[in-house]
Amino acid sequence: MRYSLRQDIAVEPVIAGWYGWSYLLPPQTLARFVHNRFNRIVESYLDDPQVHAAAVRQRRMHGGPWIHAHEHRDAIEAWYRETAPRRERLDELFEAVRRLEEDILPRHHGECLDPVYQELPAALAGRVEVFYGRDNRTADYRFVEPLMYASEYYDESWQQVRFRPVTEDAREFALTTPMLEYGPEQLLVDVPLNSPLLDAVFRGGLTGTELDDLAARFGLDGERAARFASYFEPTPAASEAPAPASSSEEDVLEYVGHACVFARHRGTTFLVDPVLSYSGYPGGAENRFTFADLPERIDHLLITHNHQDHMLFETLLRIRHRVGRVLVPKSTNASLVDPGLGGILRRLGFTDVVEVDDLETLSCGSAEVVALPFLGEHGDLRIRSKTGWLIRFGERSVLFAADSTNISPTMYTKVAEVIGPVDTVFIGMESIGAAASWIYGPLYGEPLDRRTDQSRRLNGSNFPQAREIVDALEPDEVYVYAMGLEPWMGVVMAVDYDESHPAIVDSDLLVRHVQDKGGTAERLHLRRTLRL
């Protein structure tokens, strides 16, 4: 008898006690989130958990700084007090960056910066470069990111996973609640997120002895080992197992939820912005694409940008053992707001990661991939690591524009002059996004005033902007996606649409615009098989 992980078991990444995502992996950004956001959330909660309880009961408050576990105050307080000594090292790194930004660099206005290296706090000495901007007066810096990962501040013992059953499609918002064991059905395991042990969990096909050995290597025994074993089920023999929905060798283009699209072309497989749902529980949406539908091999994994709903660690870890090469946009900043995606993914256990620059072309098996410029949706911050992926499947070209915003009206006209017409366009139209501080606030040197923050929202394209993209690229098919409509996206998003919401109005207008011109258009939801 062999055993594999049940399809209804989530394995959630945990970093420093919080739901793991990309800005929590580099130590310099983790320190900012812990100091500027997480500590404040916990202390507010401990002061008055009923305020948090009242907030999370209101749908419009989801996504705010509220803990979704008001009945577990004692457990959260105990965890917070016990981990305080471990947070001291992150506090040290936070203070070092604060001193550099607020005390050291502002004293220099054009003269040689060599003396700065002698002033650097120990946490940053030998790990940053300082320089001037082109005005020759504003001093700035960048991290030497590999040295930050090699430092004592990058501590893999902060990393865990939490096993728990999923009972419905809808997921509770996870980014503001400590990831503890809140019930006997949950299990926290100490393990680096890049550990091959996790690949063994997700690959499955384990004998009983191998399953016992895996529990032991996770440091589990007794009741905890038995709980771990309960997350696995007998694996059907190969002749009895149902074939995954994507196991056919036919060419296919399949939307599978939010911004995730699966494609197969002449035997080469692609997955864009992977976020997948679970299965194995009653009441789930019919015909949704789940982990069980994936092929054994994903030749090329493409990520458009570094937001939680496009680069979800929870999905990435579960499919890592299937993935060949990962394509990501190039980052050139090495700053707090723009850590390198390549470095993050390599520390997450991916070995073949390629960083691609604007309009660079790569051969990917039977297809060709081009990285297109991506403007907007990042709060007007200097963030380079974002791209739209154009994939040429033989004679047919498909653009995954993600949340690109057409704030430079002539750019797509100029792009079209280089790449030619595009057959199919996927475009996100969350035209009223969160304020920039919702993601980036903990990374700021000083907080934005509310008026400025609200003016720099993480917006996708509205109707006029999306229309100009479509008119410039002349596609036959246009699909609105990446709207957060699927219930499982609630784990990292907090959208609440009705028919009057600007995103729904804008996307309806775009669909009609394309259809009026004789094209095919649709706002996608859950799953859709398309021609390739």
UniProtKB/Swiss-Prot annotation:
The lineage of its organism: Bacteria, Bacillati, Actinomycetota, Actinomycetes, Kitasatosporales. Belongs to the metallo-beta-lactamase superfamily. One of its GO terms (biological process) is antibiotic biosynthetic process. Changing residue 430 to A: Decrease in activity. Interacts strongly with the diiron cluster. The keyword Iron applies. GO terms for molecular function: metal ion binding; oxidoreductase activity. Its EC number is 1.14.99.65. It comes from the Bacteria. Keywords: Antibiotic biosynthesis, Iron, Metal-binding, Oxidoreductase. Contains a dinuclear iron cluster that becomes oxo-bridged (Fe-O-Fe) during O(2) activation. Its cofactor is Fe(2+). It comes from Streptomyces venezuelae (strain ATCC 10712 / CBS 650.69 / DSM 40230 / JCM 4526 / NBRC 13096 / PD 04745). Homodimer. It is an enzyme of class 1 (oxidoreductase). It catalyses: 4-amino-L-phenylalanyl-[peptidyl-carrier protein] + AH2 + O2 = (2R)-2-(4-aminophenyl)-L-seryl-[peptidyl-carrier protein] + A + H2O. This is 4-amino-L-phenylalanyl-[CmlP-peptidyl-carrier-protein] 3-hydroxylase. Fe cation 1 binds at residues 305, 307, 377, 403.
